[in-house]
Amino acid sequence: LKYKMVLIFLIVIMLTPMTVSAHEHTPIEKLDNISDEALQMIKFQRYDDGKKLLSYFSEQFTDISNKEHPFTRDELRIITVSHDEAMEAAASPSMEYEERVQRLTKFRLVVDAIATSHQPLWTEMKNQILTAFQDAKEAASTGDTAHFHSNFNNFMALYNVIYPSMKIDVSAENIQRIDARINFIDEYRSEVVNNVKSQQELEGLEMDLKNLFENMDEDEADPSLWWVIISTGSIIILTLSYVGWRKYQGEKDMRKNRSRVHKD
C-alpha cells in the first residue's frame, strides 16, 4: 500500500505542471486575447468599446516591452503600425464598416502570428485568397478584362490583410519573390490579360502562393506538446516499473515461503 501511494503521488506531481500551464496565460497570450476582443467589438459596431480595448492593449504592450523585451525590432514595428491603423478605424466617425473590420482583422492576425508558434490564424485565409486569385487567373485566360480586374483587386485586398502577419512568419526572400510577381501583374494588367506569355507570371504566382501555405501547414507541432509527450511517457515507464517491481517482490516472497516450508 505504501508503494502504491508513492506511485500515485509521483503521477500527481508530474501531471500538475500540465494542469497549471493549461490555465495560465502568458503576457503575450493576454495581448492575443485583447486583440480578439477588440475585433469582436468592431464587428458588433461597438466602436467605443473597441477603442478602449485597443488603448488597454497599448498599455499592456508597452509594459511587456519594457519589462521583458520579448519582441524583435521588426515585430515591434509591425505591431505598432497595425495597432495605429486599428485605432484609427475604431476612432473614425466616418470610416466604412468593411474597412474597420479589415483593419482590426489585420491587427488581430499580427498579434496572433507573434503569440502562436505554429499554424497562425492568417493561414486560415488560404482558401479565400487562392479562390480569388484563381478566379482572376481564369478571367485572364479568357480575355475577360473586367472580371480580371475585379477578382485581382479582391485577391490583393485579402493578401494585404495577411501581409503584415506573413512578414512575421515567412522569410524575407519568399515574401520578396511573391511581391515581385504581384507588382509586375498589377502594373501590367492589360498585358497579362492580352498576352499569353505574360500569363506565365500568374502561373508562377499561383505556385508561390500554394507553396507558401503548404510550408506553413507542414510547420512543426507545438513545442509545448513535448511536455505532454515526455510526461506521459514517464508515467507509463514509472507504472511499468512499479508493476515489474511488484511482480519481482511477489516472486521473492513466494521463494521465501517455499524455503520456510522445506525447512519445516
Regions found by a protein language model. Give the residues of each.
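Solenoid-repeat scaffolds in large eukaryotic assemblies
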Residues: 47-57, 98-100, 148, 155, ...
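Short, solvent-exposed, charged loop/turn and helix-capping segments
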Residues: 60-77, 96, 159-176
